[in-house]
Amino acid sequence: MSAAIRPLIAGNWKMNGLRASLSELKLMLEGAGKLSATADLLICPPATLVAAFAQKLAADTGSRSNSFAIGAQDCHPRASGAHTGDISAEMLADAGASAVIVGHSERRADHGESDALVREKAEAAWRAGLVAIICVGETQGQRDAGQTLDVVGTQLAGSLPDGATAANTVVAYEPVWAIGTGRTPTVADVEQVHGFIRKSLTQRMSGEGSKVRILYGGSVKPSNAQELMAVADVNGALVGGASLKAGDFLAIAAGCP
């Protein structure tokens, strides 16, 4: 991890959580103060909870609003219109979100999202004043075929819009085969891919590319967080299941050097 880049620990709750889950957010906020000097924290609940979570964050006098934020898991590329069931970035911002995940592997697989669509969604996030967390990563078959860097490079080139900065963009590497499986790449594998992403960003964005946060996502848990966070060019984590419990999420954040 680069000492010059403040780490971000982002929790993706996926399709989990009801209003009763505010109790977990309360515990996270209570523990966040101890970690405010260590990392920025972000929780991305389902869209149905974004407003409630943002209101809780705003009302909590013990929270550190500059280091704890609420995000969302997806957005439509258009600001409004006849798109039944979809949610725009503007709506998410209005609900209190400050960031949105785009291009998650589950969206790419379940909904057939292309790099071009992910790019549009990232641009929509910026339009609404949100940080775009752009996800890239290979499947097991692609990894076995030795295509990891080719796949990640192609996704990054196609999904990252022109105009990206360290302020409006985060990149998350999530090897698809590691998500929710309990399996993680070796430290050497993570370092290779994150180094490749960093090089790609600096080639495209010049000096700005050296400042963009690159998160690792894929079965991150308290037991492996410290080792992963110590890897060069790993600037935080995109956490799935382990972010549903305050204790686990805070323990992962505590693993940041």
UniProtKB/Swiss-Prot annotation:
Active site per the UniProt annotation: 104 (electrophile), 174 (proton acceptor)
Superkingdom per UniProt: Bacteria
Residue numbers binding substrate: 12-14, 180, 219, 240-241
Keyword Transport appears in the UniProt entry: no
Major site of localization recorded for this protein: cytoplasm
The enzyme's E.C. designation: 5.3.1.1
UniProtKB keywords: Cytoplasm, Gluconeogenesis, Glycolysis, Isomerase
Pathway annotation: Carbohydrate biosynthesis; gluconeogenesis; Carbohydrate degradation; glycolysis; D-glyceraldehyde 3-phosphate from glycerone phosphate: step 1/1
Subunit annotation: Homodimer.
Protein family according to the UniProt entry: Belongs to the triosephosphate isomerase family.
PANTHER family attached to this UniProt entry: TRIOSEPHOSPHATE ISOMERASE
Protein name (database record): Triosephosphate isomerase
The organism of origin for this protein: Rhodopseudomonas palustris (strain BisB18)
Taxonomic placement: Bacteria, Pseudomonadati, Pseudomonadota, Alphaproteobacteria, Hyphomicrobiales
